């Protein structure tokens, strides 16, 4: 999904120059470019900062996470190029607006600002020390962390509804509730979002599978006309997009803004998968 933010030839050293006729060594020597070297070092430091952030999520404020999210997208994707989300009135719009507000900000500036905030969150951070491997470091900020951007308030067990359990990915509770018929698998919240919408938004693939097994309406639309496929696409969960398509989701359904699922994502791979599936059914 990421678009290159390095100048052409920055990785290979190719400056576009030609070998002079007097050089018979057979090896091309390119002029040393401090600018390219500086950009490469900045990009490397940015990637280290993104990896380090995974251990700082709990200490970062909501505003800081939004700030970091926007700059991560600016570096990896470029200028905001997706329609304003309508599937998630609060969180989705805030994330989109934070990214959109950067306008034509350069990737270099975005990387510098991102690194500065990570350093502020952890003044003792040493980029030279490798990050610990494992579950915490498996996802780059801006990937699966997109929807889990905020720390949600702790809700007492007795105050939880079925959507709270869905957000928590409590498969056992949801399965029992559906099997006992205490809850309709297609029940909707006040915004018209079904459990399947929520599971797709949060990236809970196993829960998505369970809901589909219990005959969740795969093409159910919320109050804005968006399907679960719109949600999975917008959040860039490729594996869930593929699961939905394999299970019969309709990629040709448009929301109230006239957008197809392929048009609400910033991920080229997700968009291509949806386009190919649509073409194959035509």
UniProtKB/Swiss-Prot annotation:
Binding residue positions for an acyl-CoA: 69-73, 95, 114
A single Gene Ontology CC term: cytoplasm
UniProt subcellular location: Cytoplasm; Nucleus
Gene3D superfamilies named among the record's database cross-references: 1.20.80.10, Ankyrin repeat-containing domain
Expression sites (tissue/organ): Detected in placenta and spleen (at protein level). Detected in placenta, umbilical cord blood, CD34-positive hematopoietic progenitor cells and bone marrow.
Placement of ANK repeats on the sequence: 191-220, 224-253
Major place of residence: cytoplasm
Taxonomy, superkingdom: Eukaryota
Residue ranges of the region described as Disordered: 1-31
Listed GO MF terms: fatty-acyl-CoA binding; lipid binding
ACB domain location: 42-127
Residues recorded as bearing Phosphoserine in the entry: 106
Keyword Repeat: yes
Subunit structure comment from the entry: Monomer.
Disease: Neurodevelopmental disorder with progressive movement abnormalities: An autosomal recessive, progressive disorder characterized by global developmental delay, intellectual disability, significant expressive language impairment, behavioral abnormalities, and movement disorders including dystonia, spasticity and cerebellar ataxia associated with gait impairment. Additional features include facial dysmorphism, oculomotor anomalies, microcephaly, seizures and brain imaging abnormalities. Parkinsonism may develop in older patients.
The protein, known as: Acyl-CoA-binding domain-containing protein 6
Gene behind this protein: ACBD6
């Amino acid at each position: 999904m990421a678009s290159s933010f390095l100048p052409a030839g920055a990785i290979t050293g190719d400056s576009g120059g030609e070998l002079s006729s007097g050089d018979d060594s057979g090896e091309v020597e390119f002029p040393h470019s401090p600018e390219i070297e500086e950009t490469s070092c900045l990009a490397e430091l940015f990637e280290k900062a993104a990896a380090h952030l995974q251990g700082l999520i709990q200490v970062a404020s909501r505003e800081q996470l939004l700030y970091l999210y926007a700059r991560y997208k600016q570096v990896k994707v470029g200028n905001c190029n997706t329609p304003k989300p309508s599937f998630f009135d609060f969180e989705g719009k805030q994330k989109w607006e934070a990214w959109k507000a950067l306008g034509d900000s350069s990737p270099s500036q975005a990387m510098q600002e991102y690194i500065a905030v990570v350093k502020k969150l952890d003044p003792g951070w040493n980029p030279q020390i490798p990050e610990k491997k494992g579950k915490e470091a498996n996802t780059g900020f801006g990937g699966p962390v997109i929807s889990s951007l905020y720390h949600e308030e702790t809700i007492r067990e007795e105050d939880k509804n079925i959507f709270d359990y869905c957000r928590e990915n409590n498969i056992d509770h949801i399965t029992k509730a559906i099997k006992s018929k205490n809850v309709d698998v297609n029940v909707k919240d006040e915004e018209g979002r079904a459990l399947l919408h929520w599971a797709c938004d949060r990236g809970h693939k196993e829960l998505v599978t369970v809901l589909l097994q219990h005959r969740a309406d795969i093409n159910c639309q919320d109050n804005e006309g968006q399907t679960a496929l719109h949600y999975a696409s917008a959040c860039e969960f490729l594996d869930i997009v593929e699961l939905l398509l394999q299970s019969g989701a309709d990629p040709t359904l448009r929301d109230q803004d006239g957008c197809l699922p392929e048009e609400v994502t910033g991920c080229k791979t997700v968009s291509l998968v949806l386009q190919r599936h649509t073409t194959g059914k035509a």
